[in-house]
Amino acid sequence: MFSKDTYVNRRARLAKEVGDGVLLFLGNNHVGMNYEGNEYNFRQDSCFLYFFGLDYAGLTAVMDLDAGEEIIFGDELTIDDIVWTGTMPSLSENARKVGIGKTLPLSALKEYLGKAMRQGRKIRFLPPYRADHKVRLMDLLGILPGVQSLHADEVLIRAIVDLRIHKTAEEVAIIEEAVDVSTRMHLEAYRLARPGVHEAEIAAAVLQIASSRPGGGLAFPTIATVAGQVLHNHGFIHTLREGDIFLLDAGAENADHYCGDLSSSMPVSERFTPRQEEIYQLHLRSFQAAVDQLRPGNPYRNAHLAAAEAIAEGMVDLGLMKGCPRDIAESGAYALVFPCGTGHMMGLDVHNMENLGEQYVGYAEGEKKSTQFGFKSLRLARPLEPGFVFTVEPGIYFIPELIDLWKAEGRFKEFINYDKFEAWKDFGGLRNELDYLITEDGCRVLGTLKKPMTLEEVYTAKNL
């Protein structure tokens, strides 16, 4: 947790930005996996954590800007609870730790909100992403689940995004702790990736590192695969073989729930094959092209376009594409081998604030998302500002199904040599990913440990 003053100041800034109304924050509850008592690991809602800091289930918070009061609603433990959990601080004790002096039982929440609505006051809430939140909002506010997101308050959303998107020095230090744990996870994967090893063994090893500190764990489900052309491959069903490329996309979340997110691509053999080295080096050029665009005021869309153009240039050099690389990038033809975005915001969520809406988080007000394949997957396009924390992760993927579909449809025939692609359909895919902070005059990589990137660094890491 942060200091009490941190939470008080965050709420004061939010109140000033929003101005009026009743702000409703639903904390998360326990959720059963296959029956009610067998629960998924609890994860508190990130906005609740940011403003109220209390990391346990069964809480709802209200900021009544009209009345000038803040309340946490929740129930005290009964003796039946204490038998299973042990003695815990009371709700009022916990509330005082974050600067809130008033608590009420959960049963009082519906009447509190009902009275405000009868007075004609506005209840401001965030888009729900859990089924139980949708049921609660229907009960509390009478809004059907199918239209709740339409009633979510844009003023509140934009105010929260503006606060959470700019990281303080204290937040950056905590994020770097998570990034360092993430780096150790990846260094272990370089050591373990050998012929005969199962993907699941490496996934288990990185989980152990992520979980080895109190309160720590994974920031998201690990991707550990030799089928890198499948962008989100969580199956862990393969055994590593000579000549494979092993891809790890994994990150740690620390006790404060800030995240790291890294990706690594490495040879299962001692070295990449010449063809693999060629694509890996092309990938590094695209990565550096994106990084060269990272500075205050420059839209992140330009970083994506720079990475796409570098990949297009490499595809032309290989004879897989033809024409002007810039035209290939702007047309969208590059997306045959790079169908996703270059990065995303990161913080308390690995895709930071994605529940609030990508349009608000990743795009400037009034800026429209592209509908073009490839560009439509940009989670981040807005002009960069000091304090932004985000990932950079261009990749190159040879996806047989996508190649076959585009060839059959005759898409971008003026740019793509489909016959040449036939020999590459068994290549797979690769990417690397690092986490960055925008500074006053540029950017810097987050973390005190170095993740291997160059061929020399990769080969050294595999032989430690």
Please provide the spans of the model-predicted regions.
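Active-site neighborhoods and metal-handling regions in enzymes and metal-associated proteins
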Residues: 1-464
